[in-house]
A protein has these predicted regions:
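Glycine-/small-residue-rich active-site loops that bind phosphorylated ligands and cofactors
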Residues: 1, 37, 125-126
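Phosphate/diphosphate-binding glycine-rich loops and adjacent basic-rich segments that engage nucleotide
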Residues: 1-9, 18
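Short, solvent-exposed polar/charged micro-motifs at secondary-structure junctions
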Residues: 5-6, 39-44, 158-159
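Short clusters of small/polar residues that mark proteolytic maturation junctions
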Residues: 8, 54, 122-124
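Alpha-helix N-cap recognition
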Residues: 10-11, 144
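Phosphate-binding site of ATP-dependent enzymes
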Residues: 11-88, 117-118
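ATP-dependent carboxylate activation and anion-phosphoryl transfer catalytic cores
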Residues: 82-160
Length: 160
């Protein structure tokens, strides 16, 4: 979680470091195509998408330090994008939440390359730290931190 162990490998990079003794992340790796573009995220609480945030970082991608170190990233909320793109990201976040059977709160991450929207992942245990995106989006739609936590506790279920 939190992008620990994520590496971006570009053409010409020395990939031998990923198979050297001392590589701390095990024998197997998952490889995905890197998608250039702007990064967005949208939170869902229950059956409602909250907002779209653009995540801006000079670190290359939204890695651990960009997420948890103060000043590691800038969150623009609401994202400064056209309404059609904004609405589509909100729709896709809610659709992903529902399609995966998520309950409570989730957050979907997206990349936009100027033409296509790509869903990167759905976070089913999103952070609640002072730099986390869920509390920011909740505040943006006038849900206080206390109200958010109360809603999460009231709607928690221990069934399968």
């Amino acid at each position: 979680g939190s992008s620990v162990g994520v590496h971006i490998v570009r053409s010409g990079d020395n990939t031998e470091r990923f198979s050297e003794p001392g590589w701390p992340f095990g024998t197997y790796v998952m490889v995905e195509k890197y998608i250039e573009g702007r990064e967005f995220t949208a939170a869902v609480i229950g059956d409602r998408a909250l907002a779209v945030t653009e995540i801006i970082t000079d670190r290359g991608f939204y890695d651990y330090d960009a997420k948890y170190v103060e000043g590691g990233s800038t969150h623009v909320i609401p994202a400064d994008i056209d309404q059609g793109l904004y609405d589509e990201i909100m729709r896709l976040a809610l659709l992903a939440h529902q399609s995966l059977g998520c309950r409570g709160v989730s957050r979907a991450d997206f990349r936009y390359d100027g033409k296509e929207i790509y869903i990167l992942e759905v976070n089913t245990q999103p952070g609640l730290t002072p730099t986390s995106l869920i509390p920011e989006q909740a505040a943006h739609v006038n849900i206080s931190f206390n109200e958010l936590i109360t809603w999460m506790v009231d709607n928690a279920k221990c069934d399968a």
